[in-house]
Protein backbone atom coordinates (compact mmCIF):
# COMPACT_ATOMS: atom_id res chain seq x y z
CA UNK A 1 0.00 0.00 0.00
CA UNK A 2 2.83 2.39 0.87
CA UNK A 3 4.52 1.69 -2.45
CA UNK A 4 1.28 2.34 -4.33
CA UNK A 5 0.75 5.65 -2.50
CA UNK A 6 4.34 6.65 -3.27
CA UNK A 7 3.82 5.90 -6.95
CA UNK A 8 0.60 7.89 -7.05
CA UNK A 9 2.19 10.88 -5.32
CA UNK A 10 5.22 10.74 -7.62
CA UNK A 11 2.97 10.56 -10.68
CA UNK A 12 0.97 13.55 -9.50
CA UNK A 13 4.07 15.63 -8.85
CA UNK A 14 5.55 14.67 -12.22
CA UNK A 15 2.39 15.51 -14.18
CA UNK A 16 2.11 18.87 -12.42
CA UNK A 17 5.73 19.74 -13.09
CA UNK A 18 5.45 18.85 -16.77
CA UNK A 19 2.53 21.23 -17.36
CA UNK A 20 4.57 24.43 -17.59
CA UNK A 21 2.02 27.05 -18.67
CA UNK A 22 -0.93 27.53 -20.98
CA UNK A 23 -2.07 30.55 -22.96
CA UNK A 24 -5.82 30.59 -22.39
CA UNK A 25 -6.85 33.93 -23.93
CA UNK A 26 -6.47 34.69 -26.68
CA UNK A 27 -6.54 30.98 -27.44
CA UNK A 28 -3.16 29.51 -28.33
CA UNK A 29 -2.40 27.61 -31.51
CA UNK A 30 -2.14 24.47 -29.43
CA UNK A 31 -0.38 22.89 -26.49
CA UNK A 32 1.99 19.93 -26.32
CA UNK A 33 4.13 19.87 -23.19
CA UNK A 34 7.10 18.19 -24.87
CA UNK A 35 7.43 20.88 -27.55
CA UNK A 36 6.67 23.98 -25.49
CA UNK A 37 10.37 24.91 -25.50
CA UNK A 38 10.25 25.37 -29.27
CA UNK A 39 9.22 28.38 -31.34
CA UNK A 40 5.47 28.94 -30.85
CA UNK A 41 5.38 25.86 -28.63
CA UNK A 42 6.06 23.66 -31.65
CA UNK A 43 3.00 24.89 -33.56
CA UNK A 44 4.48 26.55 -36.63
CA UNK A 45 1.35 26.93 -38.78
CA UNK A 46 -0.85 30.02 -38.63
CA UNK A 47 -4.32 29.18 -37.31
CA UNK A 48 -7.64 30.97 -37.83
CA UNK A 49 -7.13 34.52 -36.59
CA UNK A 50 -9.11 35.59 -33.55
CA UNK A 51 -10.49 39.11 -33.09
CA UNK A 52 -8.54 41.14 -30.54
CA UNK A 53 -8.63 44.81 -29.53
CA UNK A 54 -6.45 47.20 -31.50
CA UNK A 55 -6.03 49.12 -28.26
CA UNK A 56 -5.75 47.62 -24.79
CA UNK A 57 -6.64 43.93 -24.64
CA UNK A 58 -6.24 41.15 -22.06
CA UNK A 59 -3.97 38.11 -22.08
CA UNK A 60 -4.74 35.20 -19.74
CA UNK A 61 -2.27 32.48 -18.82
CA UNK A 62 -2.22 29.62 -16.35
CA UNK A 63 1.21 29.37 -14.71
CA UNK A 64 2.15 25.99 -13.26
CA UNK A 65 5.44 27.05 -11.68
CA UNK A 66 5.83 28.62 -8.25
CA UNK A 67 7.41 31.68 -9.87
CA UNK A 68 7.87 32.50 -13.54
CA UNK A 69 9.12 35.39 -15.68
CA UNK A 70 7.03 36.48 -18.66
CA UNK A 71 7.25 38.77 -21.67
CA UNK A 72 5.00 39.18 -24.72
CA UNK A 73 5.99 40.17 -28.25
CA UNK A 74 4.31 40.26 -31.66
CA UNK A 75 5.02 39.65 -35.32
CA UNK A 76 3.34 41.53 -38.16
CA UNK A 77 4.34 38.83 -40.66
CA UNK A 78 1.45 36.92 -42.23
CA UNK A 79 3.33 33.69 -41.60
CA UNK A 80 6.06 34.06 -38.96
CA UNK A 81 8.47 31.14 -39.02
CA UNK A 82 11.25 32.28 -36.69
CA UNK A 83 11.99 34.71 -33.88
CA UNK A 84 13.48 37.05 -36.49
CA UNK A 85 9.92 37.73 -37.66
CA UNK A 86 9.12 39.15 -34.21
CA UNK A 87 11.95 41.69 -34.36
CA UNK A 88 11.03 43.88 -37.34
CA UNK A 89 8.14 44.61 -39.68
CA UNK A 90 8.36 43.87 -43.40
CA UNK A 91 9.73 47.39 -44.00
CA UNK A 92 12.42 46.99 -41.35
CA UNK A 93 10.77 48.90 -38.51
CA UNK A 94 11.83 47.54 -35.12
CA UNK A 95 8.95 46.03 -33.15
CA UNK A 96 9.00 46.89 -29.42
CA UNK A 97 8.11 44.34 -26.78
CA UNK A 98 4.35 44.07 -26.31
CA UNK A 99 4.66 43.96 -22.52
CA UNK A 100 7.08 44.64 -19.71
CA UNK A 101 9.17 41.76 -18.38
CA UNK A 102 7.47 40.69 -15.17
CA UNK A 103 6.98 37.78 -12.79
CA UNK A 104 3.90 35.85 -11.76
CA UNK A 105 3.28 33.24 -9.05
CA UNK A 106 1.52 29.96 -9.75
CA UNK A 107 -2.08 30.09 -10.90
CA UNK A 108 -4.33 31.83 -13.42
CA UNK A 109 -3.02 35.32 -14.17
CA UNK A 110 -3.76 38.06 -16.68
CA UNK A 111 -2.17 41.20 -18.05
CA UNK A 112 -3.11 43.81 -20.64
CA UNK A 113 -1.28 44.76 -23.82
CA UNK A 114 -1.88 47.81 -26.02
CA UNK A 115 -0.67 46.90 -29.49
CA UNK A 116 -1.65 50.19 -31.12
CA UNK A 117 0.74 51.99 -28.77
CA UNK A 118 3.71 50.09 -30.24
CA UNK A 119 3.68 52.57 -33.16
CA UNK A 120 4.46 50.05 -35.88
CA UNK A 121 1.58 51.00 -38.16
CA UNK A 122 -1.10 48.70 -36.78
CA UNK A 123 -4.63 49.68 -37.81
CA UNK A 124 -8.13 48.23 -37.83
CA UNK A 125 -7.87 44.84 -39.56
CA UNK A 126 -4.13 44.37 -39.06
CA UNK A 127 -3.06 40.75 -38.66
CA UNK A 128 -0.47 39.89 -36.02
CA UNK A 129 0.82 36.88 -34.14
CA UNK A 130 1.27 37.16 -30.38
CA UNK A 131 3.99 35.07 -28.73
CA UNK A 132 4.41 34.63 -24.98
CA UNK A 133 7.85 33.76 -23.62
CA UNK A 134 7.77 32.10 -20.20
CA UNK A 135 10.59 30.98 -17.90
CA UNK A 136 9.69 29.03 -14.79
CA UNK A 137 13.30 28.18 -14.01
CA UNK A 138 13.83 25.31 -16.42
CA UNK A 139 14.30 27.18 -19.68
CA UNK A 140 12.25 29.37 -21.99
CA UNK A 141 8.84 28.14 -23.12
CA UNK A 142 6.56 29.60 -25.79
CA UNK A 143 2.93 29.84 -26.88
CA UNK A 144 1.51 31.68 -29.92
CA UNK A 145 -1.88 33.07 -30.91
CA UNK A 146 -2.89 34.46 -34.30
CA UNK A 147 -4.97 37.65 -34.16
CA UNK A 148 -6.81 40.19 -36.28
CA UNK A 149 -6.94 43.58 -34.58
CA UNK A 150 -10.34 45.28 -34.40
CA UNK A 151 -10.77 48.89 -33.34
CA UNK A 152 -13.26 49.09 -30.48
CA UNK A 153 -13.54 45.31 -30.14
CA UNK A 154 -15.00 44.28 -26.79
CA UNK A 155 -13.64 41.05 -25.36
CA UNK A 156 -16.03 38.66 -23.58
CA UNK A 157 -16.86 39.95 -20.10
CA UNK A 158 -15.27 36.90 -18.48
CA UNK A 159 -11.95 37.60 -20.23
CA UNK A 160 -11.38 41.18 -19.09
CA UNK A 161 -8.35 41.82 -16.87
CA UNK A 162 -8.69 44.15 -13.91
CA UNK A 163 -5.84 42.73 -11.80
CA UNK A 164 -3.00 43.25 -14.26
CA UNK A 165 -0.04 41.07 -13.21
CA UNK A 166 2.39 43.19 -15.22
CA UNK A 167 1.52 46.20 -13.08
CA UNK A 168 2.30 44.41 -9.81
CA UNK A 169 5.18 45.55 -7.60
CA UNK A 170 7.47 42.81 -8.90
CA UNK A 171 7.19 43.93 -12.54
CA UNK A 172 10.42 45.24 -14.04
CA UNK A 173 10.92 48.69 -15.50
CA UNK A 174 11.22 47.31 -19.04
CA UNK A 175 8.33 48.96 -20.87
CA UNK A 176 6.40 48.07 -23.99
CA UNK A 177 8.17 50.97 -25.66
CA UNK A 178 11.60 49.38 -25.37
CA UNK A 179 13.30 48.62 -28.66
CA UNK A 180 13.99 45.16 -29.98
CA UNK A 181 17.66 45.80 -29.36
CA UNK A 182 16.78 43.78 -26.27
CA UNK A 183 16.70 40.69 -28.51
CA UNK A 184 19.70 38.62 -29.58
CA UNK A 185 20.30 35.50 -31.61
CA UNK A 186 20.75 32.13 -29.95
CA UNK A 187 20.94 28.88 -31.84
CA UNK A 188 18.70 25.97 -31.00
CA UNK A 189 18.50 22.32 -31.96
CA UNK A 190 14.74 22.29 -31.48
CA UNK A 191 12.87 21.04 -34.53
CA UNK A 192 10.29 23.12 -36.34
CA UNK A 193 12.21 26.41 -36.20
CA UNK A 194 13.76 28.32 -39.06
CA UNK A 195 16.82 30.50 -38.75
CA UNK A 196 18.34 31.86 -35.58
CA UNK A 197 16.13 31.95 -32.52
CA UNK A 198 15.59 35.41 -31.07
CA UNK A 199 15.16 35.58 -27.33
CA UNK A 200 15.11 38.47 -24.89
CA UNK A 201 18.68 39.13 -23.79
CA UNK A 202 19.37 38.04 -20.24
CA UNK A 203 15.85 36.69 -19.83
CA UNK A 204 17.01 33.65 -17.87
CA UNK A 205 19.45 35.71 -15.81
CA UNK A 206 16.75 38.26 -15.12
CA UNK A 207 14.41 35.52 -13.97
CA UNK A 208 17.07 34.21 -11.59
CA UNK A 209 17.85 37.70 -10.29
CA UNK A 210 14.21 38.50 -9.67
CA UNK A 211 13.76 35.16 -7.95
CA UNK A 212 16.70 35.85 -5.64
CA UNK A 213 15.33 39.32 -4.93
CA UNK A 214 12.00 37.76 -4.05
CA UNK A 215 13.69 35.39 -1.63
CA UNK A 216 15.51 38.28 0.03
CA UNK A 217 12.26 40.19 0.42
CA UNK A 218 10.61 37.13 1.91
Curated annotation (Swiss-Prot):
Effect ascribed to mutating residue 65 to A: Leads to a hypomelanization phenotype and growth defect on copper-deficient conditions
Residues linked to a glycan: 87, 91, 124, 158, 170
Residues lipid-modified (GPI-anchor amidated serine): 190
Signal peptide coordinates: 1-19
Binding-site residues, Cu(2+): 20, 65, 138
Localisation: Cell membrane
Membrane topology: Lipid-anchor; GPI-anchor
Biased composition (Low complexity): 165-194
Keywords assigned by UniProt, alphabetized: Cell membrane, Copper, Glycoprotein, GPI-anchor, Lipoprotein, Membrane, Metal-binding, Signal
Cofactor binding comment, as recorded: Binds 1 copper ion per subunit.
GO MF term list: metal ion binding
Recorded superkingdom: Eukaryota
Knockout-associated phenotype: Exhibits growth defect on copper-deficient medium ot in the presence of the copper-specific chelator bathocuproine disulfonic acid (BCS). Shows a reduction in cell-associated copper, in the enzymatic activity of Cu/Zn superoxide dismutase, in laccase-dependent melanin production and in the accumulation of cellular iron, a well-established copper-dependent process. Shows a distinct cell wall electron density pattern, which is not due to overall difference in cell associated copper levels or copper adsorption ability.
GO terms for cellular component: plasma membrane; side of membrane
Family from the record: Belongs to the X325 family.
Cited function: Lytic polysaccharide monooxygenase-like protein that has diverged to biological functions other than polysaccharide degradation since it does not perform oxidative cleavage of polysaccharides. Cell surface-bound protein that functions in the copper-accumulation pathway shared by the CUF1-dependent copper transporter CTR1. Involved in maintaining cell wall integrity during copper deficiency. Binds Cu(2+) with an estimated 1:1 stoichiometry and might serve as an extracellular copper ligand.
Protein name as it appears in the record: Copper acquisition factor BIM1
Organism annotation: Cryptococcus neoformans var. grubii serotype A (strain H99 / ATCC 208821 / CBS 10515 / FGSC 9487) (Filobasidiella neoformans var. grubii)
UniProt lineage: Eukaryota, Fungi, Dikarya, Basidiomycota, Agaricomycotina
Protein encoded by which gene: BIM1
Amino acid sequence: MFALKSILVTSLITSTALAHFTLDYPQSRGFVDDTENQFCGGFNTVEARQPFPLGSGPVHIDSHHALATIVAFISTSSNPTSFDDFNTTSNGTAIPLASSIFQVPQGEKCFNIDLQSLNVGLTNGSEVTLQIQYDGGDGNLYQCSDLVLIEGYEVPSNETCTNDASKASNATSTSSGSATATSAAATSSSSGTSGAIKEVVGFGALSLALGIAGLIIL
